[in-house]
Structure formats: C-alpha cells, structure tokens
Amino acid sequence: MPTFVFADIEYTGSAAVEQRYFLQDALYPQQERANLSVYFAPQAYTSFNDGNDSISFKGFYRFDQQDEERTHGDIREFKWTHSGEEWEAQAGIGKVFWGQTESLHLVDIINQTDAVEAIDGEDKLGQPMVTFSLFKDWGNTTVFALPYFRERTFSGIDGRIRPALPVDTDNPLFESEDEEKNLDWALRWQHTLGDWEVGLSYFDGTSREPDFVVATNESSEPSLRPFYPQIQQAGIDVLALMGGWVIKFEGVQRKVMDEDYTAFVGGFEYSFVGLFDSVYDINWLMEYQYDGRENQSNVIAQNDLMLGTRLVFNDIDGTQILAGVVQDLDHSNVRSGFIEASSRINNHWKWRVDAYIFSSDEPTEASYMLRRDDYAQLSLEYYF
C-alpha cells in the first residue's frame, strides 16, 4: 500500500486597495465617478509522492464600494497534478492561457472572462477541467475535458462600463439543452522550432462570448439576457524572433449557429536596447485586428490598428510603462487609448496605474456605450 508524505504547505498571495476615478459624469443616474475596491487573493501549494503529485489553490475575493455585481469571489485554481516522465494529468479547477499577441487574445478560449474586473479581458474565472498532456520531441499535446460552463460576469446597474440595459445574469440562455452542464472539449499542440513558437488548437463547446437577447426581467423592466451558443473553433498562434523583431499572430476560424467566420490579429514588437546609451529599453508595437462579423454591433475589433510603446527601466524595482492607442479604420472618430505602469516599492509592496480613454461618436459601434467611461485607477498591492 503506497504511503504519501506531504511536504510543507507553501502559503503566498496578494491583497490590494484600488481607487478608480472616472473622468466624465456617468450616462446613468445610479453611477458614480469615484469608486474604491479591495481584493484578497490567497494561494497555497503542496507536493507529495516524491514531487510527482501536487495540489495547488488560488482564491480571489473582491469587495466593491459601488457595484454589487463586482463584489464577488472565485476559486481561480484548485487542482491536483500528477507528473510522469513524459506526461502529466490534472483534475480540478484551473486557468489556462493560450496566445501570443498584445492587444487581443482570440485563441484563448478555455477560461471565461471575469469581465467586472477590467476592460481588457485579461482576468479569468476558474474552469472545472480534466486534462492529459503528452510531452514529446515533436511538441506538447494536451487534451481538455470541460464538464461545467462558467457564465461571464457583468457590471450591475450601479457599475460603470456597462450597456444601456442591465444584463440579466440570473436568466441566461443556452443553445445546448444541457445548458451549463454541456461537456466541452479542446485539444492543443504547441512546439518550439528554433526561433519560432507555434500553437494549434481546437475547441468544441459552449461559447465563452455571449450574444444578447432583449427581454424583461422579474421586475418587468427591459434587460439583456446573455445567450451562449455552441461553437467549433480552430486556432493558430505564432511567435517568431528575428533579431530585434518579435512577430506575433493569432487567428481563428469559428462556426457559430451555422455561420462561419474568420478573425485574426497580427503584428510586431521591435526593441531598442539601451536607448540613447542609457539603461532603458523601449519597444514599439503594432498590431492589426480583423473580425469577419462585419455587421455585428457587439464586435469591437473588426478592422482596427493598435500602435503602442513599452518603456522598460531595467531597475531593481521592475519599473515599466506600456501605452497605446487602438484606431478604428472604418470610423476615424472611434478610438481608444490605454496606459499601464507599475513598479515595486520593496519586496512586499507594489504600485500600479491603469488608465483608459474611449472616443466614439458612432451609435452603431460596440464602443459607443463606453464613450463616457474614461478612467484612471491607482492600485497599491501587497504580496506575501
């Protein structure tokens, strides 16, 4: 009978206070310009069976001053991992990231977006999953079984960055008769070939990106009900190193409700090392975004160009600044801009500044609902 000896449990995590200030008055009377929130994100890890098995946990809880829907908790990760010589199996709740580009992640489809967290869609909810990975000289292959679907979070009636009608998250609609219990599955192969990194993926299941149906809620008020269709998605992501150039590309072919369309994002990042004989590095970024759903009003990245720059200070505090603008090439008066800056104060404390500006005078564009939601956010983060 095998005996399992657990190593010590490692506890880490972070907590933060965030002050967000919107630069313009809100469109709707329930909304405020200033908003304070705090979050706590504990982590734990232990290994056993001579390091061949491990259990990891990542939790998250946020309290928001204004928006009840943004006050929420989630298990980002709680999984068991068993590692063999050339294979690995996992079961539980996990987070997986696919992709290479900066401005948009098209192939990243395993986890649902925690949309109340930030406008960039980088924050994800934990996804129940069982995975099996095979590691060979010809690449790494992983099969995913996803037995339960997570619905996307949305700001409530008191929150900013939301559509004109509130989203009725209590009454979602599904194409699958199994609703959130539909068994989704995915397959991914990735490999490094010299200076090239290539990933191929396939997903079959419930779309993480909902459509919306205008309806009435329990109070007989108009609302938007999320509708989650079944989709099939084939994806490719590529990164290539060419001297000071980094070429990035992501593309998908999707079938949704008997409609096929293509979307892709691609571009480059070029690095100037030691700017003007200093310790600073500056990177220039450009990416083009295309989506074949040209008549879909809820699609933002249809025919857009992102230009940006990243300034790396190369100091002991890891200071860096990323700034950029995304221009709609179909409408000259539709664009957005962003700034992300961060630096460590000491071994435990870090500050972060995030700012977003939205400009849209086209009512038919998805970004029109954000036209008064320019904001700046200051975060003070503690790591333990």
Task: For the regions a language model picked out, list residue spans one by one.
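Transmembrane beta-strand segments that form the barrel wall of outer-membrane beta-barrel proteins
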Residues: 15-25, 54-65, 76, 113, ...
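Membrane-embedded beta-strand positions of outer-membrane beta-barrel proteins
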Residues: 13-15, 55-59, 91, 132, ...
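Residue-level signature of outer-membrane beta-barrel architecture
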Residues: 9, 44-48, 81-84, 93, ...
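Outer membrane beta-barrel
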Residues: 45-161, 194, 360
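Residues that define the transmembrane beta-barrel architecture of outer-membrane proteins
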Residues: 32-38, 71-76, 124-128, 135, ...
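Repeated loop/turn-to-beta-strand initiation elements of outer-membrane beta-barrel proteins
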Residues: 9, 49-55, 86-89, 138-141, ...
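Detector for outer-membrane/organellar transmembrane beta-barrel domains
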Residues: 244-328
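Outer-membrane beta-barrel "beta-signal"
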Residues: 132, 268, 357, 370-384
